[in-house]
Amino acid sequence: MDTQIKDKMNKKQINTSEFVDPSSPLDVACLIHSDGYDWSYVDKLYSMVSRHITKPINFHVYTEADRPVPAPYIKHSLINWGISGPKKSWWYKMQLFNSDLYRGPLLYFDLDTVVTENIDWIWKLNLRHFWAVRDFKYLWRPHWTGINSSVMWWNTAQFDHVWREVQSRDLNTIINRYHGDQDLINEIIPIA
């Protein structure tokens, strides 16, 4: 991830002020579902993040209940929604907002993210905001403020209303209405 991404992060505001304890490990997550990516992507992402951050990390893997997850990874079993395929599995990212699976600050990366330099600056961002990379399809359109969900930083306890909103709707209706998870996130957490 290059330094320009730092300038392309959008923030979405809430009412509490919070920072990560500098002495605590950073909680980092990824999601692997179905056969779109093999396990080597998890290992590579873990390696990249570990090399490019100075804090110790806890690495969380959100995946199917029956998928084995070796140490040192922390497994979170996803609810099986029966969705599969390379363009549908991204809907499982909505479960990252379920604070019953993990509660607290969480830095999320898609499995195909490449981290190339130090990312310590991310954990210093104020957690009263929801932080995500700006949607790269619209980088040259300054009026567009939508996010790309490939890199996100937030406190799951403060944004669990996203999960509750997803649960309150019919999943098939959501999938048919929105192009992908980030469109729904953009609607539920409007840019401040």
Tell what function each PLM region has.
Residues F59, F97, D112, M152, ...:
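A residue-level signal for conserved active-site and pocket-lining positions in enzyme catalytic cores
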Residues K44, M48, H52, L96, ...:
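Amphipathic alpha-helical segments that form well-ordered structural scaffolds
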Residues R67-P70, K75-W81, Y92-W144, W154:
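GT-A fold catalytic core of metal-dependent nucleotide-sugar glycosyltransferases
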Residues G82-Y92, G180:
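A short, glycine-/small-residue-rich helix N-cap motif at loop->alpha-helix starts
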Residues T156-A192:
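Catalytic core and acceptor-binding pocket of nucleotide-sugar-dependent glycosyltransferases
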Residues I5-S84, L101-Y102, T156:
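N-terminal anchoring/stem segment of glycosyltransferases
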Residues S24, K55, K93, F109, ...:
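Residues that flank catalytic or metal-binding motifs in active/ligand-binding sites
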Residues N118-D120, P142-H143, I147-S149, V162-Q167:
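A short secondary-structure junction signal
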